[in-house]
């Protein structure tokens, strides 16, 4: 009766597949607004139509079929609470929580992509972080003469957060579209590695 314990565990994993949502008009949403319905979708040979006289005039169907994005988010959270009644009116409480997250971002542009004309492009990056919080406090409550109440509280709190730890690579110039972002080593050119 004097000790109360509580534990909690929450885990989630999300997968998100989408088309590219790039900046400066190079997203499917933008292209659906500005691409003229009078322009053909494909050329007579089956390739995607592109009007070379207008800059940043991307064919939205080409973008849907040639530019891919896949993201994954993993999250884990653990919480615990202990409350101890030392005596009437005096309790001591301790809380601890830990959360961990990992985000994986992948995208690829095929060799036929209109948004990236470097014979295919791919990128993979992963970022992770964690956070810990510990707090402990005591409460004292005393009523005098059924009229006056004295309430005191004292405690300590500590927090640690580490985020943005990760790396990524961007590559270009593939022989074909078979590997996409799954094996960046097959590209002929590495633009950057971030860490």
PLM segments and residue spans:
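A conserved hydrophobic secondary-structure block that centers on an alpha-helix together
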Residues: 85-94
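Surface-exposed loop/interface segments of Gram-negative outer-membrane beta-barrel transport/assembly proteins
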Residues: 1-77, 93-195
